[in-house]
Design a protein with these regions (language model features):
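A general structural detector for well-ordered alpha-helical segments in enzyme core domains, enriched
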Residues: 7, 68-70, 92, 118-122, ...
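Divalent metal-coordination and catalytic microenvironments
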Residues: 3, 15, 49, 86, ...
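Short, well-ordered coil/turn elements that cap or connect secondary structure elements
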Residues: 10, 27-30, 44-46, 76, ...
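Binuclear metal-ion centers of metallo-dependent hydrolases, dominated by the metallo-beta-lactamase
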Residues: 14, 22, 26-41, 120, ...
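Short glycine-/acidic-enriched loop or helix-start segments at secondary-structure transitions
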Residues: 1-4, 25-27, 61, 92-94, ...
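Core dinuclear metal-dependent hydrolase active-site scaffold
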Residues: 36-98, 165-172
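Active-site metal-binding motif and surrounding structural segment of the metallo-beta-lactamase
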Residues: 1-26, 32, 98-105, 127-128
Length: 172
């Protein structure tokens, strides 16, 4: 959950999470929070959000159980974005990409999530137009070369890979 509480309190943004994290966020003083669960989708004023499976652990900063980990499938202004979050590779990613994806955001760090090889396999299952690698280089055991990953994606798939530096953004 990282800086979620501080950001939500500072900006008044609504958080969207599984039910267990939702309850924890409310207990931390977050005022606008919406609970969901895997497989569920909901239309919001900004677009549609659907929670997908993810294969990972889920503990909150205080050590309490964070519920089932999840990814997010977003539909915003007609664009479909899949944020895999912390996960390992799973074959059902093919289903997530079936209706077309404009962007897939996938971890490449290895050790705690899928690494570059499995992330490349995920891209082949998802078939997005654009891939953005995440969850790497924040500490020693997940150091990766995102440019090498990007080159492999563009050599072996029809996807374009966009490597973002901290603080950068990507516009659809």
């Amino acid at each position: 959950v990282g800086d979620t509480v501080a950001i939500a309190q500072r900006t008044g943004a609504m958080t969207i999470s599984n039910f267990e994290i939702h309850n924890w966020l409310l207990a931390q003083g977050v005022e606008k929070a919406h609970p969901m669960h895997i497989g569920g989708g909901k239309d919001f004023p900004f677009g549609r959000v659907k929670l997908t499976i993810a294969h990972h652990g889920s503990a909150l900063p205080d050590g309490s159980y964070g519920g089932n980990p999840a990814g997010f499938l977003l539909t915003l202004e007609g664009k479909r974005i899949y944020h895999a979050c912390d996960t390992g590779l799973f074959y059902d990613m093919k289903l997530i990409g079936e209706d077309g994806l404009d962007v897939a955001i996938v971890p490449i760090g290895d050790n705690f999530t899928m690494g570059p090889d499995d992330a490349l396999r995920a891209v082949k299952l998802l078939e997005p137009k654009v891939v953005i690698p995440i969850h790497y280089d924040t500490f020693d055991v997940i150091e990766q070369d995102p440019q090498s990953f990007a080159a492999r994606v563009e050599e072996q798939t029809q996807s374009r890979c966009v490597v973002l530096n901290p603080g950068e953004s990507y516009r659809l």
